[in-house]
């Protein structure tokens, strides 16, 4: 089971309670589904990581994000939610 937390602006990934790796910079929040990790930077961009490697970045004005499979839900600064599938904006609500 993988979990993530943000410490000193970097994502720390834990596996079975042990620190596995750290990655990213200027990170304010992060979430994982066990496979993919999404992180929100201080500039409001969403970064998507797989096994600690950056896959893609997208969005703007992000405050927090959640991930499930290939779908990422991003809460923006203006209170809206943007849904991305494979890095492409699907809908906003």
Could you tell me what each predicted segment is?
Residues 17-24, 52-59, 89-93:
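A short beta-strand motif characteristic of beta-propeller blades
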Residues 78-93:
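Blade-level signature of beta-propeller repeat domains, shared across WD40, Kelch, NHL, RCC1
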Residues 8-11, 43-46, 78-81:
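Loop/turn residues immediately N-terminal
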Residues 37, 46-47, 72, 81:
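Extended, compositionally simple hydrophobic/Ser/Thr-rich segments
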Residues 1-19:
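An edge-strand/N-cap motif at the start of beta-rich repeat modules
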Residues 1-6, 35-41, 70-76:
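Short beta-strand elements that form the blades of beta-propeller/WD-repeat-like
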Residues 24-36, 59-71:
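Repeated scaffold domains used in trafficking and secretory/extracellular systems
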């Amino acid at each position: 089971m993988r979990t993530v937390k943000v410490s000193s602006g970097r994502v720390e990934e834990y596996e079975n309670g042990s620190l596995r790796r750290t990655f990213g910079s200027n990170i304010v929040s992060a979430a994982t589904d066990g496979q993919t990790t999404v992180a929100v930077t201080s500039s409001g961009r969403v970064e998507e990581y797989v096994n600690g490697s950056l896959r893609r970045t997208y969005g703007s004005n992000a405050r927090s994000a959640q991930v499930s499979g290939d779908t990422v839900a991003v809460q923006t600064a203006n209170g809206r939610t943007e849904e991305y599938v494979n890095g492409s904006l699907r809908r906003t609500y």
